[in-house]
From Swiss-Prot:
Gene3D superfamilies: DD-peptidase/beta-lactamase superfamily. One of its GO terms (cellular component) is plasma membrane. The lineage of its organism: Bacteria, Bacillati, Bacillota, Bacilli, Bacillales. Pfam families: Beta-lactamase. This is Protein flp. It comes from Staphylococcus aureus (strain MRSA252). The keyword Membrane applies. Its main location: membrane. PANTHER family: D-ALANYL-D-ALANINE-CARBOXYPEPTIDASE/ENDOPEPTIDASE AMPH, PENICILLIN-BINDING PROTEIN 4. The chain crosses the membrane at residues 6-26, 389-409, 433-453, 471-491. Its precise function is unknown. Has no penicillin-binding activity and is not involved in methicillin resistance.
Length: 499
């Protein structure tokens, strides 16, 4: 590579990096940031930032810590057209977070001796059978709980199954004799049908409908009096309207659904009701303590699942961080429930849009809770030095202007033949050294939040930094790379001496 090409490559890379960083900081800036020692304001800022980024119309968020409600609040709208604001009483479809109720109900029936987790499913669902390599296979209740039955995740994707069968009995008959993906008990594969079958077992054992049993045995005792199960697409006063994105605009969505999928996906509830569920999960009464602990116990390894080591009874678990959690997604709703029994807190996010920002928001809130004292210290320190940061911003802006003037002058000189590019091994070496320095600085900057605060990223940090500090960071990054460009110009150009 010639010195001239290397020179222009160096300049191009540095400019691109500087522009990218500046754009990234600008896009993640929020002039409404309110960083004080009040955790409520910090958390509001984080929530509003993520909801805005995800174009989420409305959400209700609950944080319970040490048995007390730290936050239970609605953001945005449960109904955009009617301007009905989301609140703690807004009901959302919580999708797969229904599974934890189904799993706990099965464990309770086992504790009562009404079934055994090692029972063959066909003992309670006589017509049920599945094949593996053409041979009939025994599937146990425990394997359904653990998602290791081998039942394919897409087994009910065929229209002939989903549209013509709207009862649990009918759909299990429709798939009877189908081929399993794996031999039961050998491999984890997430499938709603596992928990739909558990719902059918609950019905057959209790001689009640699944919804009636869950309501009478769990929801009412937990005072979850406004929780229900979806029956149709009609909406009542407190029900959130579901939305799907068209571009970046949320539009009302009423997708078809299947009643037989209720034990896996169609509980409707609010953060007001889930407050009781979270408190029960974190601090259960003595008579339920062993049952709740059992429901959090690992049943199968979940290799390949993000952030999860194992699957329990309707929960994913992360043993490294002592987390119990589950996401829930439908075409027009999403939810996420996270528990940390060891540190005694829980987080719930319910939204009326299927958005990847729901789990991101939970991650950010979890980080905020775990590192609250550290953030408060950093926040307090930064606010004390706002004036100094403003001075640094002015100085950095001055450096940028000087670097721009120098670069423009050098470009004018080169165009008029007053300077030429140096060609030597030394300048080539210095060019590569400059590039390596640039990369090293970029890596250090990327890792800075982790080095200072631990296990964070810039996207999260920028949600709560004051605007003064964001401006300082932006100008500092641009000034740094401007000076690198200036250095390259000095190294690679020399004035033509007049004869």
């Amino acid at each position: 590579m010639t010195t001239k090409k290397l020179y222009f490559l160096s300049i191009s890379i540095i400019i691109l990096v500087a522009i990218s960083i500046a754009i990234y900081i600008t896009l993640n800036s929020n002039t409404k940031t309110r960083l004080t020692n009040d955790s409520q304001q910090q958390i509001d800022t984080i929530i509003e930032h993520d909801l805005q980024k995800g174009h989420i119309p409305g959400a209700s968020i609950l944080i319970v810590k040490n048995g007390k409600v730290f936050l239970n609040k609605g953001y945005g709208y449960q109904d955009v057209d009617k301007k009905v604001k989301a609140s703690p009483t807004t009901k959302y479809e919580i999708a797969s977070n229904t599974k934890a109720f189904t799993g706990l109900a099965i464990l309770k029936l086992a504790q009562e001796g009404r079934l055994n987790l090692n029972d063959d499913v066909s003992k309670h669902v006589p017509h049920f059978k599945m094949n593996y390599n053409g041979q009939n296979e025994t599937i146990t209740i425990k394997q359904l709980l653990a998602q290791t039955s081998g039942i394919p995740s897409d087994i009910t994707s065929e229209d002939s199954v989903t549209n013509k069968n709207n009862r649990l009995n009918d759909v299990t008959r429709a798939i009877m004799g189908d081929e399993l993906h794996h031999k039961p008990g050998e491999e984890f594969e997430y499938s709603n049908m596992n928990y739909d079958l558990l719902g059918l077992i609950i019905q057959n054992v209790t001689k009640q409908s699944y919804t009636k049993y869950i309501t009478n045995s769990w929801l009412k005792p937990l005072h979850m009096t406004h929780t229900s199960f979806k029956q149709n697409n009609n909406k009542s006063k407190h029900d959130a309207i579901g939305y799907e994105l068209q571009g970046s605009t949320p539009v009302v969505s009423k997708p078809e659904f299947n009643l037989w999928d209720t034990p896996s996906a169609y509980m409707m509830t609010s953060t007001e009701d889930l407050e009781h569920w979270i408190k029960f999960q974190l601090n259960p009464p003595d008579k339920y303590k062993s049952l709740v602990q059992q429901s959090h116990k690992n049943l199968s390894s979940t290799i390949g699942e993000p952030n999860a080591n194992a699957y329990a009874s309707g929960w994913f678990t992360n043993n490294d961080e002592h987390l119990v959690f589950h996401s829930g997604t439908l075409d027009n709703f999403s939810s996420f429930i996270l528990l940390n029994p060891k540190q005694n807190y829980g987080i719930v996010v319910l939204a009326n849009l299927n958005s990847e920002y729901v789990p991101k928001l939970v991650e950010h809130l979890n980080t905020q809770i775990v590192n609250h004292k550290r953030y408060s210290t950093v926040a307090s320190m930064l606010n004390q030095y706002k004036d100094q940061f403003n001075i640094v911003t002015v100085l950095m802006t001055t450096l940028i202007l000087l670097a721009f003037i120098f670069s423009a002058y050098r470009a004018w000189q080169m165009r008029h033949g007053k300077i030429i590019l140096r060609k030597s091994k030394l300048t080539t070496f210095l060019s590569w050294l400059t590039l390596c320095l640039c990369i090293a600085i970029a890596l250090i900057l990327y890792a800075l939040p982790y080095l200072i605060l631990g296990s964070n990223n810039w996207s999260f940090v920028l949600t709560w930094l004051p605007i003064e500090i964001k401006l300082t960071l932006t100008t500092a990054f641009i000034a740094l790379f401007s000076m690198l460009i200036t250095l390259l110009l000095i190294l690679h150009t020399t004035t033509i001496k007049k004869p």
